[in-house]
Amino acid sequence: MSQNTLYLLQSGFHTTPAMLDKVSRLYSEGDAVVLMGDAVLAIEHPFFQQCSTLFALEHDLELLVQPLPAHLHSLNYATFAELCLAYSRCISLK
């Protein structure tokens, strides 16, 4: 089990910038981020360039029309559950 933190970012389009400000202050190297819902629409935000482990649910990626960044990994629901269990700390930001 990883001692790093898994951040679950789920927000509406208009509240995403404030949520990203919070997580950017908490994020440490080795942490992972999962984008959920409208949060995937902020994929071009500069914060995500420093995230070495970035995920999004495959269902939510259907919201994007541009090609996916190479550092963004798609998750189905089973792998999402496994990912959550792999981290000792999981923080959900909405």
Where are these regions (language model features)?
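Short, glycine-rich nucleotide/cofactor-binding loops
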Residues: 4-20, 32
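Redox-cofactor binding/interface segments in oxidoreductases and associated redox assembly factors
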Residues: 7, 35, 91-93
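Short beta->alpha connector loops
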Residues: 12-15, 37-41
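Short, charged, surface-exposed secondary-structure boundary motifs
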Residues: 17-18, 63-69
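Short, conserved loop/helix-junction motifs that constitute active-site signature segments
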Residues: 24-29, 45-52
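Short internal beta-strands
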Residues: 33-38, 53-60
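Short, charged/polar "capping" segments at the starts of alpha-helices
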Residues: 40-44, 62-65
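C-terminal structural segments of small proteins and small subunits
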Residues: 66-94
